[in-house]
Amino acid sequence: MISASRAAARLPLLLPRGGPVPAVPGLAQTFWNGLSQNVLRAASSRKYASEAIKGAVIGIDLGTTNSCVAVMEGKQAKVLENSEGARTTPSVVAFTADGERLVGMPAKRQAVTNPHNTFYATKRLIGRRFDDSEVKKDIKNVPFKIVRASNGDAWVEAHGKLYSPSQIGAFVLMKMKETAENYLGHPAKNAVITVPAYFNDSQRQATKDAGQISGLNVLRVINEPTAAALAYGLDKSEDKIIAVYDLGGGTFDISILEIQKGVFEVKSTNGDTFLGGEDFDQALLQYIVKEFKRETSVDLTKDNMALQRVREASEKAKCELSSSVQTDINLPYLTMDASGPKHLNMKLSRSQFEGIVADLIKRTVAPCQKAMQDAEVSKSDIGEVILVGGMTRMPKVQQTVQDLFGRAPSKAVNPDEAVAIGAAIQGGVLAGDVTDVLLLDVTPLSLGIETLGGVFTKLINRNTTIPTKKSQVFSTAADGQTQVEIKVCQGEREMASDNKLLGQFTLVGIPPAPRGVPQIEVTFDIDANGIVHVSAKDKGTGREQQIVIQSSGGLSKDEIENMVKNAEKYAEEDRRRKERVEAVNLAEGIIHDTESKMEEFKDQLPADECNKLKEEIAKMRELLARKDTETGENIRQAATSLQQASLKLFEMAYKKMASERESSGSSGDQKEEKQ
């Protein structure tokens, strides 16, 4: 039987302690009853001085739907084109049946025929638990498999292999890294990566993990609206308050900032991490499926390939309706039943689409109002409204923003590229290339711990400028308690259980004493990335315990290291595959050129030498027939050998032709002399 004191020793709840007071056992209850609220606080804020970074710092917008990379060139940020010539890259990763990994547009193109192994919008899963309500909603809407990982997080599965959302993000980041390296002409190691402003600590940590897995040194994680504000305000001299309305592919953020002589100070931020273009696509998809069933009695939800075609058509129609008042959705041979093939032909007007997504647009209103309230500004105080994210191209969204803020939004920044540009500018600041900019961001959600009765006691309130550090002294909740469990939460609800549990740790070795006597100082330290560090110290013994908060799931150090190795292995496989393809292209080109020249100069070439060369070509073709099992180096060597042999033969032909020309020329001269 566990004694009362031993049972009490495992109580996880702390009692907020008043101070400084004599250590009288009965006094603790007095404080708990609320007769004194002078909670001992030691709060301090510090600036993080970063040393100048060597080499280029790339800025990456790791988006839900599309990603973008930029670098500083002098005082200007430049958005880079990928290998397909596009300035944005779809955040899509696919695994083919033979194990090849595709990223970006090649992955998106084959989604219809490979829906179960093509991952998109996985940013919405990053840092989330499998049991989260948002994840449950996503499971119903996506064709790929979302599974529970051993740590309770939401992961995805392809061909029987499990991948964390951080890994999928890392594959996209590797593509961004490669794009930057192709432009710069040298390796790119350092990066600034953006996250939605309303991301919690788990999601920020998981994004940083993605950077690490991709081989990047993530110098800073900054908020997307803040990055967009940097892109907007870098060359602006006037002081003003601006609002950044960021409705992207998967998330919505609203931030209120004050720009003053190069200082960008975030006054407040709000948002919804599960609201974006993907939801607009899904709403239209459901409408189309419903209409198709009404007209044909065929339920498309049972056909993943047909659904993927409808999903792509929905995205295309959504984009077209931003510039047209009506669009046609035509999908021939979408499915079939006993009566034959079924085609989808539908006209969709802009007003119809606006009706379908009206509730989604309406969901952006309350966060905007809350952000203004928290920043203590009215709409008349806001000098400019910046639109960020592809969904802000929708006229109805622009009208909603105008109604909200009482002014037409600015078109000063490219909504697809502003965030990456801002990230590159912040990279320039860290590298010492941009010196006249200071960024003061905020933490989006309140942070605190669970205390007696399951109450959420806040140490750092939302919209506090970061980096910041705050401390508060607590005490034990039971007599003889020798250890306390610190549960760290993030959110705005009064009860700890209603907020996000970021992590927990235990401080042990507290000398037994009556409840309320020990003094336990809990310190929260938020770094410039918005990532939380927590420590607890028994002031009596000096014993301390500290952690960098990871979610109660999250990736362990070993898991991250394994994923880094896997990413490197994939990079090596990609390099070998590319090397092989280039060698095959070279070989096929040499075969084509050789055969063309042999036909052209057949009269000048010795028959036996021609036959030898034909044998070489036949051997080369045999090698190419088994190209999938050959190395690029072997194919290249064989191709080079064939090229050398053909050059020797054609050299003989040229010499023969030259001597024939000379002899015909000299015989002509002799004829002239005789005349």
UniProtKB/Swiss-Prot annotation:
GO terms for cellular component: cytoplasm; mitochondrion; nucleolus. Residues 434-443 are annotated as: Interdomain linker. Signal peptide: none annotated. The chaperone activity is regulated by ATP-induced allosteric coupling of the nucleotide-binding (NBD) and substrate-binding (SBD) domains. ATP binding in the NBD leads to a conformational change in the NBD, which is transferred through the interdomain linker (IDL) to the substrate-binding domain (SBD). This elicits a reduced substrate affinity and a faster substrate exchange rate. Upon hydrolysis of ATP to ADP, the protein undergoes a conformational change that increases its affinity for substrate proteins. The keyword Hydrolase applies. It is an enzyme of class 3 (hydrolase). One of its GO terms (molecular function) is ATP binding. It comes from Gallus gallus. Belongs to the heat shock protein 70 family. Interacts strongly with the intermediate form of FXN and weakly with its mature form. Associates with the mitochondrial contact site and cristae organizing system (MICOS) complex (also known as MINOS or MitOS complex). Component of the TIM23 mitochondrial inner membrane pre-sequence translocase complex. It comes from the Eukaryota. InterPro entries: ATPase_NBD (IPR043129), Chaperone_DnaK (IPR012725), Heat_shock_70_CS (IPR018181), HSP70_C_sf (IPR029048), HSP70_peptide-bd_sf (IPR029047), Hsp_70_fam (IPR013126). It is found in: Mitochondrion; Nucleus, Nucleolus; Cytoplasm. This is Stress-70 protein, mitochondrial. Residues 1-48 form a transit peptide. Its main location: mitochondrion. Its EC number is 3.6.4.10. Residues 444-675 are annotated as: Substrate-binding domain (SBD). Keywords: ATP-binding, Chaperone, Cytoplasm, Hydrolase, Mitochondrion, Nucleotide-binding, Nucleus, Transit peptide. The N-terminal nucleotide binding domain (NBD) is responsible for binding and hydrolyzing ATP. The C-terminal substrate-binding domain (SBD) binds to the client/substrate proteins. The two domains are allosterically coupled so that, when ATP is bound to the NBD, the SBD binds relatively weakly to clients. When ADP is bound in the NBD, a conformational change enhances the affinity of the SBD for client proteins. Residues 65-433 are annotated as: Nucleotide-binding domain (NBD). The keyword Nucleotide-binding applies. GO terms for biological process: chaperone cofactor-dependent protein refolding; erythrocyte differentiation; iron-sulfur cluster assembly; negative regulation of erythrocyte differentiation; negative regulation of hematopoietic stem cell differentiation; negative regulation of hemopoiesis; protein refolding; regulation of erythrocyte differentiation. ADP binds at residues 65-66, 315, 318, 322, 390, 393. HAMAP family: DnaK (MF_00332). Mitochondrial chaperone that plays a key role in mitochondrial protein import, folding, and assembly. Plays an essential role in the protein quality control system, the correct folding of proteins, the re-folding of misfolded proteins, and the targeting of proteins for subsequent degradation. These processes are achieved through cycles of ATP binding, ATP hydrolysis, and ADP release, mediated by co-chaperones. In mitochondria, it associates with the TIM (translocase of the inner membrane) protein complex to assist in the import and folding of mitochondrial proteins. Pfam families: HSP70.
